Amino acid sequence: MRRSLALALTAGSLAASAASAQACPDARAITRGVRAPLSHVRYLADDALQGRLAGSPSERCAGDYIAAQFRALGLRPAGDAGTYFQSLPLASAVDPHAIGGTGRNVVAILRGSNPALAGEAVIVGAHYDHLGHGGSFSMAPGDSSIHNGADDNASGVAAMLDVARRLARGPRPARSIVFIAFTGEEEGLLGSSFYAGHPAVPLDRTRAMLNLDMVGRLGAGPLIVYGTDTADEWRAMVDSAAAAEGVQVRGGGDGFGASDQTSFYARGLPVLHFFTNVHADYHRPSDDWEKIDAGGLERVAAVVARVARGVASRPAALTFHRAAAPAQAASGSGYGAYLGSIPDFTPVPDGVKLTGVRAGSPAEKAGIRAGDVIVRMGEMEVHDLQGLTNALRAHKPGDTVPIVLLRDGQRLTVTATLGTRGG
């Protein structure tokens, strides 16, 4: 980004923040009687926050709240011009339906304790935007009620803040920890992709990324951890951390998926995505804070804190591994049917451009290849990664669907028989 643009965006961000400060809902009043980390969900998923649509005034209030929590924990600001905010344009060729304007990642650093390793970092992140009043990504078409996004993803932000609390109270890890609340995830991983291109700590000195997305419904079920095949050491580290907290885990697979870890795996970092599975309230107005498993949320945060501390304190870097096998999922229903396409985040005017397909996948069998742009699947137009995810979720394994592609400027249709992840 050019310096002039960066300064302009920063100035606009600070001005908007100052202008909206008095209008933001009173966090103390909203969270009275609710203990952290659930109190963070209680605030972020309150009706007064209007669903935290990326770039909206209510999302700015959410960002201000998160920055205040970082400040209270003693974390250093790592955004623009000495602030906690990293401004970015939300208008995107990847998603022509994005709200536009300027969004903000909220970025803070817990400095590492070892002078020789403090210049290296581990990222712990969670997106804080949601759907506002619904729109095209809602699973309740035509319902313009507030979509509060308690599990998706106020829960991830709350868990991230609890991880920060646990690590800040000491002993501090050897490496630094970068905590990031991402904007624009629902619009196509905009915030995480921008940060990956403009990192507070260079990515060649960033050792791993831990993503928390939808971690508020643990209940009796296992904690799902995607991405354990992205480093040789992950499985043992995750199993050890979970066992110490009495949490059952299930997972595996590579680092590609419909959440922010993808932006970092695509750039060669080991990643994990912590997840407590999909549910009937996903992308609906009914995803409210009262349904969050408070005890489970704390246990997830405890597991992630152990993993983060382990990665940040180990003498050697992780052994990165780009998994060849399809991503594993604990439940075939979690992300719908499986195609096996690998997205390329290079902006295109419309659709989802692919960097490749997985060997033996339905995509490969259908003749889809690197460089293709998916613009339609079945009856659904595909404008962006979220649209592709929604199209897959609308189908079940075994469905045979026409897929419209753009290849070398030509429009063509192939037919794919969708499979199951890991099958």
Regions from the language model: what does each represent?
Residues 24-31, 47-57, 95-96, 141-153, ...:
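Second-shell loop/turn segments in exported
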Residues 303, 312-423:
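C-terminal recognition in membrane/secretory proteostasis and scaffolding
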Residues 108, 124-130, 135-189, 304:
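Alpha-helical metal-binding/catalytic segments enriched in His/Glu/Asp
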Residues 280-324:
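His/Asp/Glu-rich mid-to-C-terminal helical/loop segments that flank catalytic regions of hydrolases
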Residues 21-77, 119:
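N-terminal hydrophobic or amphipathic helices/low-complexity stretches enriched
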Residues 52-111:
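A non-catalytic alpha/beta surface segment that caps or lines the substrate-entry region
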Residues 44, 70, 88-93, 100-138:
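Acidic/His- and Gly-rich active-site-bordering loop/insert found
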Residues 172, 182-279, 293, 297:
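Metal-dependent peptidase/peptidase-like ectodomains
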